């Protein structure tokens, strides 16, 4: 039944949900990759769709920006709609020289400056990591499709406009691949409910070089990431 933030009926979500931050990216995926896609929720214009990809039933829904927003939607999907797997597909800022604009980054784990997982985990640090089976499937699919990917630790930030840019040098030293704003929250919710989660990202900005993509490009052109993720769930 509908929740405070999702109006879909029971059974309208597939067991696998792809979750971009931007609801218009969810619409783009539904319009361009899914067959027989149906809009099943649009509360607060957070669009969600269910359709099929090569015969596989799949849903896609926006999460909004930041840990609090994705935590709300992931909780309701896992707890109230029986969703088993959520794969965040989004954008990130690279912090290493060997990672370029439009490269694909897969978040094996997510460090963070957010406090939400400490609140969940009795005020001690929780190692927020992806589900191995989802991770392996995406990496194997990337190899099969000949798509190069970077796999490793990412950083989930609470602030987009950080007052502490010196943190990026520390991230690079410790092998962080890129910065985004949701993965650690998603991984924490998945762990809380015994479900599966993964994050697959396209580099939209490079923190060191200042290169960036436009908002229109972020909405519609990251097709390698979308295709890779959909192929991995077949």
Swiss-Prot record:
Its EC number is 2.4.2.1. One of its GO terms (molecular function) is purine-nucleoside phosphorylase activity. It comes from the Bacteria. One of its GO terms (cellular component) is cytosol. The active site is at residue 205. Homohexamer; trimer of homodimers. This is Purine nucleoside phosphorylase DeoD-type. It comes from Colwellia psychrerythraea (strain 34H / ATCC BAA-681) (Vibrio psychroerythus). The gene is deoD.
